[in-house]
Amino acid sequence: MNQTLLSEFGSPSQRVENALESLRNGRGVLVLDDEDRENEGDMIFAAQNMTVEQMALTIRYGSGIVCLCLTEERRQQLALPMMVERNSSHYQTAFTVTIEAAEGVSTGVSAADRLTTIRAAIKDNAKPTDLNRPGHVFPLCAQPGGVLVRGGHTEAAVDLTTLAGLKPAGVLCEVTNDDGSMAHAPEIIAFGRRHNMPVLTIEDLVAYRRALMREVS
């Protein structure tokens, strides 16, 4: 990733710290992956404090595929089977079956309904019967070990919310341009300026986590 493009958002460690503070304060962040990987930017919000307005923003400026990133432990708590037995997607993106809140939604498509579904899935005492299947929210299961094991947006969402001291669950959606094409670094940076969202890379988060591990050891 071209570090010059991101310099206005601080050093790599500052970018992570800014992202954590943003999530704690109920704001979103923008996460870029490697140029040799998907080369895309995702909006990420903490599931715990996401608002209807933020969900509407996500739907309006994103791909429309709103994903809820969960730990394996939470996936098992909700008894969510994986979408397929054999994952042949290029980056092994770990989709489960889609979900809908069993109560409190109409068609499940609106910003309010999707947020109701997310809140049902992350509440402390959530159980499988709280959710109907299929639905309009796409859960993703993060790899244990996070970005140190898999450098994906799913793992970044769970790592960031965990490091922020929030529930380990994030809502993400790929950012798209007005013409429907995928947004890359220059467009993501411009989007961050417009919507007051810090930008960081998965590479930043990997380095940050490794530094924390060195401090502990």
Swiss-Prot record:
It catalyses: D-ribulose 5-phosphate = (2S)-2-hydroxy-3-oxobutyl phosphate + formate + H(+). GO terms for cellular component: cytosol. Binds 2 divalent metal cations per subunit. Magnesium or manganese. InterPro entries: DHBP_synth_RibB-like_a/b_dom (IPR017945), DHBP_synthase_RibB (IPR000422). Keywords: Lyase, Magnesium, Manganese, Metal-binding, Riboflavin biosynthesis. The record marks H136, E174 as: Essential for catalytic activity. This is 3,4-dihydroxy-2-butanone 4-phosphate synthase. Homodimer. Its EC number is 4.1.99.12. GO terms for molecular function: 3,4-dihydroxy-2-butanone-4-phosphate synthase activity; magnesium ion binding; manganese ion binding. Belongs to the DHBP synthase family. Mg(2+) 1 binds at E38. PANTHER family: 3,4-DIHYDROXY-2-BUTANONE 4-PHOSPHATE SYNTHASE (PTHR21327:SF38), GTP CYCLOHYDROLASE II-RELATED (PTHR21327).
